Amino acid sequence: MNTFFKLTALAGLFAITGHAFAVDDITRVDQIPVLKEETQHATVSERVTSRFTRSHYRQFDLDQAFSAKIFDRYLNLLDYSHNVLLASDVEQFAKRKSEVGDELRSGKLDLFYDLYNLSQKRRFERYQYALKVLERPMDFTGNDTFNLDRSKAPWPKDEAELNALWDGKVKYDELSLKLTGKDEKEIRETLNRRYKFAIRRLAQTNSEDVFSLAMTAFAHEID
């Protein structure tokens, strides 16, 4: 059993998993919950960190350098395509990356929760923007390109650059549906449902989601 599955099993013993709930259309960012760490997560974090730093087959020091690696992995789990967060967001939190080890040891996962909450806000803004783009006339006559894998690309420096990326994403989604034989009305209806569903999912997240992602970043970095 590798570290990831060991850690998942440990978390299952100590943590209480939240449940998704039905929500209506989300139209305001204040309808997205601001997630906070729960008591059981602090306990699990302390125990898991202690266990792995003492007994893991791969010896490692949970120092500033290793903390930075965990931070980078967590960041990319949150925004793999580098099309949600801004470069300034990343820079703001990167200043705290050396704190990751101390947070895992103490069980006070402030950085993980703060960054997750910001990514939720940014993701809401992106899908709201995508819904507005859907209202524009569709035009497939240009020679636009869309980079499907932006995992190595820099984060957008400003909102204009971010909007340009999402203009491309929406056009790609539209074209993909057009190639299946859907007309413009069907394309708009399909994507409207898809983007609104993505927004509703944001409102269904809970503290367990943040904790699980933080533990995943930690586990994968030591495997």
Q: Over which residues does each language-model region extend?
A:
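Flexible, low-complexity junctional segments that flank or bridge functional domains
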Residues: F4, A20-D223
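Gram-negative bacterial Sec-dependent N-terminal signal peptides
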Residues: N2-F21
